[in-house]
């Protein structure tokens, strides 16, 4: 029996290190509203919550989560059961989102520990624009890009053909063609258009169309936490 105890101790120690490694890769997202109006924050995964100016909602995101996004909904009305509608960013009429929202919406996107122990994060206008936002990783690692923003008030400058109540659709969302959505015959040969150049001119760090990776994707070491701020 004397030899059994050290074996179990070793197994427990190994498991502890393994679990610590998982925790390091998980992330906390602090989502704050600095807009002079109420927004209904949404996260997939995460759900949703009403935020008055100055309020913060904190969510925990599991290690290895990819395809994650955070956005603001505007012009919402919900009943006591959490059912209702939003003018922009609506997710199937639910306060607590179970999936992605409707266009237009400014997106803070991320993939945790997606490749070589790196998180990937970006701001996307591929679904259009509704609320200015910034995304800031908390890491001070020099290999981390840092804060990225899209703080231009695009709604007031939106081309008439893309304008909707409370937001500005992307050309892909408005016309749904291969040229603007980089699909079909355009999937591997898709460049910027006058519409995407408009969005890029307003928010140079944000995705302006689906293939805008080179100037719009940023990385941080896995285990980083993030702050998303609407209007700030």
Curated annotation (Swiss-Prot):
Belongs to the thaumatin family. Induction: Induced by UV-B and salt stress. May be involved in disease resistance. The keyword Aminoacyl-tRNA synthetase does not apply. Disulfide bonds join 35-231, 76-86, 91-97, 144-220, 150-203, 158-168, 172-181, 182-190. Keywords: Allergen, Disulfide bond, Glycoprotein, Pathogenesis-related protein, Plant defense, Signal, Stress response. Residues 1-21 form the signal peptide. Strongly expressed in roots and in female and male strobili, and, to a lower extent, in cotyledons, leaves, stems and pollen grains. Glycans are attached at residue 194. InterPro entries: Osmotin/thaumatin-like_sf, Thaumatin, Thaumatin_CS. The keyword Protease does not apply. GO terms for biological process: defense response; response to salt stress; response to UV-B. Pfam families: Thaumatin. This is Pathogenesis-related thaumatin-like protein 3.1. SUPFAM superfamilies: Osmotin, thaumatin-like protein.
């Amino acid at each position: 029996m004397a030899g059994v105890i050290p074996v179990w101790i070793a197994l427990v120690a190994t498991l502890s290190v393994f679990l610590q490694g998982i925790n390091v890769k998980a992330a906390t997202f602090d989502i704050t509203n600095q807009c002079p109006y109420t927004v209904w924050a949404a996260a997939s995964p995460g759900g949703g919550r009403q935020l008055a100016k100055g309020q913060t909602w904190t969510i925990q995101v599991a290690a290895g989560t990819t395809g994650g996004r955070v956005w603001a909904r505007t012009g919402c009305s919900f009943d006591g059961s959490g059912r209702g509608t939003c003018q922009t960013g609506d997710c199937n009429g639910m306060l607590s989102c179970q999936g992605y929202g409707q266009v237009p919406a400014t997106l803070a996107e991320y993939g945790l520990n997606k490749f070589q122990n790196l998180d990937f994060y970006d701001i996307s206008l591929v679904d259009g624009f509704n609320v200015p936002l910034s995304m800031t990783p908390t890491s001070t690692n020099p290999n981390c890009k840092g804060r990225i923003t899209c703080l231009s008030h695009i709604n007031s400058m939106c081309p008439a053909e893309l304008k909707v109540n409370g937001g500005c659709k992307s050309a892909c969302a408005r016309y749904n063609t291969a040229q603007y959505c980089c699909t079909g015959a355009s999937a591997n040969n898709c460049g910027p258009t006058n519409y995407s150049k408009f969005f890029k001119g307003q928010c140079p760090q944000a995705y302006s169309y689906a293939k805008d990776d080179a100037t719009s994707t940023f990385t941080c070491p896995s285990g980083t936490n993030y702050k998303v701020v609407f209007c700030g």
